[in-house]
Every structure is written in C-alpha cells, then in structure tokens.
C-alpha cells in the first residue's frame, strides 16, 4: 500500500517517518522516491534523527542528488544544545499529490513491512486514505517540516476533494506544542457516542 501511494504521485510526495531502516524495504522505498524526483515530482523526506541513525544513508544521498529535499527532525548533535534530545517525531505518513495518504503505526523496514511468512516482524496497523481528511495530514506535515527547516514554507491549499467513502475520519495530532490532550478527549467522546460497536487497535493498553 505504501508503494502504491508513492507510485501514484505525479506532482508531489511528502514523507515523514520515525524509522527508515537500512535494509531491502527501506532502500526500496527511498529508491522509489528517488526515481520520482528524477521524473520531476517534488519529493520531501522528513525523518527523525534518532530513529534513522542507522538509516539508508547511501539511498538518501542519491535522493538528494536527484533533487529530493531531505531534513532530519531534532538533530542529536546540534549546537548550541537545545536540550531536546527526547523530543522525537514518531509520526508516519506518505502524502501523494495532497490527495492520498498512507499512514498508521508502521515504520519503513523489514520488521514492519515484510510479507515473508517466516520473518520476525511487528504486527501493526496501517491504512490508505483519500478525501477531505487528507488536508489535515498536509497541515501536520507542513508544520513539522517548518520546525525542521526553521522557516515558514508556502501553505498549499488544495481544492476540497469529494467524499471518497462513507467513513468518519478525524486526525488528532499531539505533541509538546499542544497544551491540552485532544486525543484522550476524542477517544472518550467517541466511546460515549458509540451505539453498536467499539473497535480498538493499540499496541499498548496502560
């Protein structure tokens, strides 16, 4: 599904992940981004510096050479020290043409995306999305990109897409810049509003 979203892009691809591993899966994804950049697609790749300490550096270098923009969120060795070593970005998303999204709990790597029956991989949830909620993903990516590059970027507002399905979707970002806890409030509200069914998918239930 992640590769399908990348391959569908004709104008822009925005990618944000905590981990992109230096393995067959990680290199395959970055190579696909590089090919898109060579073909004139605007590619922006944002990775967490700590999560990608062992990332596919050669493939990323090739992406930059092809015209792709690459930034790291919260570099570890940054002077003067900002004291934000534990400020990590765990978001995961691929946005194609501001119209389609791949997101969820998966990072990019064999441990997350391998379909080999004997592989030691995580069982994780991911989804693809089209419709009006995509704009919120675009806004979140733009905000994180601005933090990483230290300057404002042009805000791209896409025409409101037609409804792609009948699902109700709400993206709830969280972080130290958000004072309240909208995720907690949103979950409680959703539970109260449920009439026939409650499905919960989470790796942790503390």
Show which residues each predicted segment covers:
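Charged, low-complexity intrinsically disordered terminal segments
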Residues: 1-206
